[in-house]
Every structure is written in C-alpha cells, then in structure tokens.
C-alpha cells in the first residue's frame, strides 16, 4: 500500500525550490494561525480571518505548485501528497463548519478537535511527499531538510501541552509528587520525540550544519507560536 502511494523523484532543482517556497508560505500561515489561537482569540469569532487567509492561500499555492510539477513530469499517479491535500481540504471545510457552529477553539482544544486532527494528518502527508520525492534517496536535499524540520515543528506544536520547555514555571512550580512526576516524564517524552527525528536524519549522513538547520527551522516555526521559552 505504501509503495503505491510513494511519489516519483523530483530531480529538477527549480521544482524543489518551488516546493520550498510553497511549503514556507503554508506553514508560516499555520504558525500565524496558531499564534492567533493563543493570543488574540477573544477578539474574533470568525473563520474568515487574515491568518486563515495566509494558511489556506498557502495551501492553494502548495496544491497548484504540486499539480504544475506533476503535469510537467507527466506524473498522473495518486500519491501521498494528493492524499494529504485531500485530507487537508476536507479538514479545512470541516474546520469552517466547526467555527461557524461552535466558535473558535481555546486552550488545548485546537490540538484535539477532529477538524484540526485532519489538518495535522494532511499536513504530515504533504510534508512526506516533499521528503519522499527527493532526487537521491541516500541524502537529504534542501527541500527534504525543510520538510523534516517542518514535521518536527508540527510535532512539537501538537505536543505542547506535555512540553515543559515552553512553560517551565507552570510545570515545576507545584511541589506535589504527581506534578513533579508528570513534569519529569514530559522531559523524557520530548527527548524521545526529538531523538526519533534526529536519529532518523543521521542515517542519511547529514552534515552537522544541516542538523543545526533542521533544529533552527523547527525552533523558528514554534517560536512564532510559543515564544514563552524566551521570556521565562
């Protein structure tokens, strides 16, 4: 099944650069939207917001650029990228209905609502398309590095409620054992997640500067949404 969904290699550098541009547009929009959920959610109760405009216009650019590249390559295969785009589109429509009926999510709600879970899944699959379509399966090019970093940033965002590094005071201020145990376990949990990402990257003989680039990109993304790590 997974082999059937595997994308064809995209070898043209200009097409890979186009994928980076589209990916950055969409995910910057995603982090701006996430910041809005965190900081100014009380001011607007509509789905039609500037940050949703950035996010979904970025999604449109991703889809159009992917279709353009596939057409140029005469690639009419249904792959993981198309599957991810379909899931993301359904999630976006569901999110619009959700917002219209139930309002805007607050607190932990944006991480666990069905519509947002569909958006997360669709985004992961589209990132996997960028990663899996790299020209050389043995090394990571710039586009695949961006895809891996964006995937890690998305993982960090989704698991922020069990991440003590963004709100250390909130995690460690209580002296009760249950809070201390949860805080300690969350440290190990985040270490495990980051280890999976970076150990996987090591198998491609990634240079140290590129490992640093993966971390820098992911941190830059998440600090748009969760800058409290810098202020504590």
Predicted regions and their residues:
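N-terminal signal-anchor module of multipass membrane proteins
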Residues: 2-59
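Membrane-interface helix-boundary motifs at transmembrane edges
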Residues: 10, 71-78, 134-141, 201-210
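Alpha-helical transmembrane segments of multi-pass integral membrane proteins
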Residues: 19-29, 81-95, 119-128, 141-164, ...
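Long, hydrophobic/aromatic-enriched structural stretches that serve as scaffold segments
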Residues: 63-66, 70-103
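Membrane-interface helix-loop-helix junctions at boundaries between adjacent transmembrane segments
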Residues: 76-80, 97-147, 167
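Single conserved hydrophobic/aromatic residue that forms the stacking wall/gate
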Residues: 223, 228-232
